[in-house]
Design a protein with these regions (language model features):
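Active-site-proximal alpha-helix that buttresses catalytic centers in soluble enzyme cores
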Residues: 2, 7-83
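Short active-site segment of divalent metal-dependent hydrolases/proteases
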Residues: 12, 164-165
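Phosphate-handling substructures
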Residues: 13-17, 21-33, 77-139
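Glycine-rich phosphate-binding loop signature in dinucleotide/nucleotide-binding domains
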Residues: 51-54, 148-154
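Conserved histidine-centered catalytic loops in small-molecule metabolism enzymes
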Residues: 52-86, 107-121, 189-199
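A short, acidic, amphipathic alpha-helical segment used as a generic capping/interface helix at domain edges
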Residues: 137-151
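Domain-level recognition of soluble alpha/beta enzyme cores
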Residues: 172-198
Length: 199
């Protein structure tokens, strides 16, 4: 049994732009930063979330907004942070907002706080021609759950994205009216790769 805490990144630049231009925002920006609000959200979670001190492993998407969120939340905690492409937002391909930076650039900025040993130098999930399918997302989520179940740690935090985490938690994609909250710990007691939480 694993106790998984799923945390959506803080408010990012594309979240704000989306309110102005809709889905065009996802092509207008590449790998956006947290806004000032997002920086505050993640810092506040790090300050007030008591459970963070019991976390044995942090798994984080290698996109900038999630790396910023994770390092803000856990800056005062001695815990391993491991970046994994499998935690990128859906679709992991096509939309510029989900195109991560090269590994060497990430290492320069975040190492040794974050471990990037699992990443290829370039974003292997990135594809300018093809949109990731729901079936591919489903496989990504199940592979991630299998990876977690093989780990020795019991209490694990995942810092990722709205659509990926909703599918990880509930096995479905949520609409814009039911998005996950920014910087809120959704808990899942993971028993198998088909375990889902109740809403």
């Amino acid at each position: 049994m694993k106790n998984i805490y799923c945390i959506r990144h803080g408010t990012a630049e594309h979240n704000v732009l989306f309110k102005e231009v809709g889905e065009k925002a996802y092509m207008m920006l590449r790998d956006s930063n947290l806004t000032n609000v997002g920086q505050i959200e993640s810092a506040q979670m790090g300050k007030y979330w008591i459970e963070k001190n019991n976390i044995e492993l942090v798994l984080v998407s290698p996109l900038t907004r999630t790396l910023q969120t994770a390092t803000n939340i856990f800056k005062d905690v001695n815990v391993t942070m491991l970046a994994l492409d499998e935690l990128k937002e859906y679709p992991a391909s096509y939309e510029n907002i989900n195109h991560r930076k090269d590994r060497k650039e990430l290492v320069l900025k975040y190492h040794p706080t974050v471990n990037f040993k699992q990443l290829a130098e370039t974003d292997k999930l990135w594809d300018t021609e093809n949109h990731e399918t729901i079936e591919q997302l489903d496989a990504r989520v199940k592979n991630m759950k299998d990876f977690i179940l093989k780990r020795k740690e019991t209490n694990i935090a995942i810092v990722s994205h709205n659509t990926f985490l909703a599918y990880f938690l509930y096995g479905e994609i949520v609409d814009y009216d039911n998005e996950l909250k920014h910087c809120f710990p959704y808990k899942l007691r993971l028993k198998s790769n088909t375990t889902y939480a109740n809403k």
